[in-house]
Amino acid sequence: MSFSVDVLANIAIELQRGIGHQDRFQRLITTLRQVLECDASALLRYDSRQFIPLAIDGLAKDVLGRRFALEGHPRLEAIARAGDVVRFPADSELPDPYDGLIPGQESLKVHACVGLPLFAGQNLIGALTLDGMQPDQFDVFSDEELRLIAALAAGALSNALLIEQLESQNMMPGDATPFEAVKQTQMIGLSPGMTQLKKEIEIVAASDLNVLISGETGTGKELVAKAIHEASPRAVNPLVYLNCAALPESVAESELFGHVKGAFTGAISNRSGKFEMADNGTLFLDEIGELSLALQAKLLRVLQYGDIQRVGDDRSLRVDVRVLAATNRDLREEVLAGRFRADLFHRLSVFPLSVPPLRERGDDVILLAGYFCEQCRLRLGLSRVVLSAGARNLLQHYRFPGNVRELEHAIHRAVVLSRATRNGDEVILEAQHFAFPEVTLPPPEAAAVPVVKQNLREATEAFQRETIRQALAQNHHNWAACARMLETDVANLHRLAKRLGMKD
């Protein structure tokens, strides 16, 4: 089999049709899955000896949240080292990273696997993986044809990464230096709320403004602070953390500003405070609403004038510190109640950010669950950790009052429980492994029983026609998008439409 000019042109067109990178990537692998007739495809970005999924088709949604470290995935490591097309034999002893992650085929292992490393010049930037359930599924395609596919994918990925780099540099102050060497914190989530938050982080990171991060307990406020620091010109300098809620009143001032020898009982030597440690860097004050009014006044002075005094010292020290503060309280109400200074609130909230609770993030819960499953797999030395359909359904309908932190603990506990009831190093998480209180799954909708006026085959075909028509209307008559919505293979959908008389 060989690719026609029309097929290659179609792939190139799909890469140009999307508005954003994510849309282009999704179109690419959906088209490839249709052209190559594979069961699953994935586009991965390479970063710091791990592959990060950018777009998937035919794989469980939680794959988008997983991070595939080369040390734990020998097939992906082989792809990264190869420099050319890699075909894994059906009897390969190397475990496939997607075993158990193809919906409806959780109990079966992938039999055919092809890996295409993607390069920008001599640098590895990603990989394209193609998987199938039949051992000889990709034998009809030559290496030369697959290299052509890899070149198209590499060009799209390289351009996207270059655009991201240029956009980041354009947001930097004119005298700032690039900070590509600093490892970026990964914030997992594709929901509208998280997408907006990431944009706001990118905007404010390039400035030197103070930021107030608000959100419920467990939403990931510290992760937001890390992301701001790592994307800022201060990234090469320290990010210093202080939990204000854990500060005893007797040592709080010393922790913030330091002390000199003999300043109080037990001060046996000079000691720098958090502000000095964070000089030229960033200070993250977690649970800022717990500070006493007296300390709030001293903190306000530092923000106003940029100098500090160690406890017991009359001299002032100049510091250059960016302050990021976080709270799970409504500080506006705290100001009205007289428990928080209004002037400090306005100083801190120059650029406020709000982290959405997990219950408002839709399918992000599945992506995060995949991320934590992969963490557990590596930590416990397991070959795979897979979420069953029942477990995914449960996670999507639980409200998670403890947010992301509660999800992380729930996944870890479920892995331990599942491992205890199974032999071997493969873990499948079922709904019963999660101990969520008061979880009510939505009941199936009751429907009126229609009067039967046609035989079963006619009724089935009528239902199929109407379902396909509605899906096409919702997806602007894009057959690939329609197939994704109906969770079926696009080639099978075309064949069904022809049989139903919907296509010539």
Swiss-Prot record:
GO biological process: phosphorelay signal transduction system
This protein's UniProt keywords: ATP-binding, DNA-binding, Nucleotide-binding, Phosphoprotein, Transcription, Transcription regulation
Pathway recorded for this protein: Nitrogen metabolism; nitric oxide reduction
Keyword Transcription regulation listed: yes
Modified residues (4-aspartylphosphate): D57
Binding site for ATP: 215-222, 278-287
One GO MF term attached to the UniProt entry: ATP binding
DNA-binding residue intervals: 479-498
Keyword Transmembrane helix among UniProt keywords: no
Pfam families: GAF, Sigma54_activat
Source organism superkingdom: Bacteria
Listed InterPro entries: AAA+_ATPase, GAF, GAF-like_dom_sf, Homeodomain-like_sf, NorR, P-loop_NTPase, Sigma_54_int, Sigma_54_int_dom_ATP-bd_1
Record domain Sigma-54 factor interaction: where: 187-416
Transmembrane segments: none
Database matches in SUPFAM superfamilies: GAF domain-like, Homeodomain-like, P-loop containing nucleoside triphosphate hydrolases
UniProt-listed PANTHER family: ANAEROBIC NITRIC OXIDE REDUCTASE TRANSCRIPTION REGULATOR NORR, TRANSCRIPTIONAL REGULATORY PROTEIN
Function description: Required for the expression of anaerobic nitric oxide (NO) reductase, acts as a transcriptional activator for at least the norVW operon. Activation also requires sigma-54.
Protein name: Anaerobic nitric oxide reductase transcription regulator NorR
